[in-house]
Amino acid sequence: MAAATVTVEEVRKAQRATGPATVLAIGTATPANCVHQADYPDYYFRITKSEHMTELKEKFKRMCDKSQIRKRYMHLTEEYLAENPNMCAYMAPSLDARQDIVVVEVPKLGKAAAHKAIKEWGQPKSKITHLVFCTTSGVDMPGADYQLTKMLGLRPSVNRLMMYQQGCFAGGTVLRVAKDLAENNRGARVLVVCSEITAVTFRGPSESHLDSMVGQALFGDGAAAVIVGADPDERVERPLFQLVSASQTILPDSEGAIDGHLREVGLTFHLLKDVPGLISKNIERSLEEAFKPLGITDYNSIFWVAHPGGPAILDQVEAKVGLEKERMRATRHVLSEYGNMSSACVLFILDEMRKRSAEDGQATTGEGFDWGVLFGFGPGLTVETVVLHSVPITTGAAITA
């Protein structure tokens, strides 16, 4: 028997990329149905047959007015809800109807975003080696990752990872996972897809559960996709952001701050009032741990991509860190135009940032700054922190077709 001619260490070295994982393309998609926030309280209380709850409707109007959301996109239409009245109750068995929607529509919406990312990337789909699919809704087997592989015509040997029920922090999670995959598999090109549809969480109002109504005022549907790879071939690939470091942590004394429970009535959502306080109280520690190795202490000198869980979170983070209003411009734009799309939000914000940076004539994809931070906040209370490095903008770059 012949002896091996290489060592394990040599094999491992050959498997690893040389440079950092890099975002090479971004695509986004929404359902066609657009809901304007100013009209939503009347619509919501009418479709749920709750117009007799006049005081509660006034509270909901105030929630919508304070949300800083202008419009959202939702797959659920009035016609579908009229055909499924149990989905309009606060607590009525409706999981089957919800599942029938999301197991079909989540991969379909993800496909629309993935098509845009792949088109911008400009390389053959056969070069995609890994697929990471994330959604808060629609657990099924085989999963949305399998369905998307078939829909896109990816290679049967693509390495798939399906992430269900993570929640709003998961836009950071998928980038952290994609970074590890790209940097530890030389030549890997990772397709990351976050697809979120609120059909699992929609429900009627309850006077005893105002936290559920907060979700009804904030959540919207959307999907985003990115291509991630290390050592890009800059003759045919256009780097957008480098993923420099990534970490996850559970905030102290935050158990029960954000919960979701999948039941016969769908996915119930529970929120404590002090979520903005918990996040702002701990945000400086996350920033210090991420940026101390870089010698960065001025957080107005970096670009910001923060999950827009709601305006109060953004307001309190700005106040705690002393941020100038411009730093959250891309984040607040996505909140205004799409609402809270859970895991997909931060990828929408990256897309908005690189496009706006190019349109404004900035020197880099990160609003002219070299370094940036991406935060995901969600159940746990869990925080994902990703350190980003922008790239110089060349003529025509950083804007998708």
Swiss-Prot record:
<dbReference type="InterPro" id="IPR016039">
    <property type="entry name" value="Thiolase-like"/>
</dbReference>
<dbReference type="Pfam" id="PF02797">
    <property type="entry name" value="Chal_sti_synt_C"/>
</dbReference>
<keyword id="KW-0808">Transferase</keyword>
<comment type="pathway">
    <text>Secondary metabolite biosynthesis; flavonoid biosynthesis.</text>
</comment>
<keyword id="KW-0284">Flavonoid biosynthesis</keyword>
<dbReference type="Pfam" id="PF00195">
    <property type="entry name" value="Chal_sti_synt_N"/>
</dbReference>
<comment type="similarity">
    <text>Belongs to the thiolase-like superfamily. Chalcone/stilbene synthases family.</text>
</comment>
<dbReference type="InterPro" id="IPR001099">
    <property type="entry name" value="Chalcone/stilbene_synt_N"/>
</dbReference>
<dbReference type="GO" id="GO:0016210">
    <property type="term" value="F:naringenin-chalcone synthase activity"/>
</dbReference>
<dbReference type="GO" id="GO:0009813">
    <property type="term" value="P:flavonoid biosynthetic process"/>
</dbReference>
<keyword id="KW-0012">Acyltransferase</keyword>
<dbReference type="InterPro" id="IPR018088">
    <property type="entry name" value="Chalcone/stilbene_synthase_AS"/>
</dbReference>
<dbReference type="InterPro" id="IPR012328">
    <property type="entry name" value="Chalcone/stilbene_synt_C"/>
</dbReference>
<comment type="function">
    <text>The primary product of this enzyme is 4,2',4',6'-tetrahydroxychalcone (also termed naringenin-chalcone or chalcone) which can under specific conditions spontaneously isomerize into naringenin.</text>
</comment>
<dbReference type="InterPro" id="IPR011141">
    <property type="entry name" value="Polyketide_synthase_type-III"/>
</dbReference>
<feature type="active site">
    <location>
        <position position="168"/>
    </location>
</feature>
<protein>
    <recommendedName>
        <fullName>Chalcone synthase 5</fullName>
        <ecNumber>2.3.1.74</ecNumber>
    </recommendedName>
</protein>
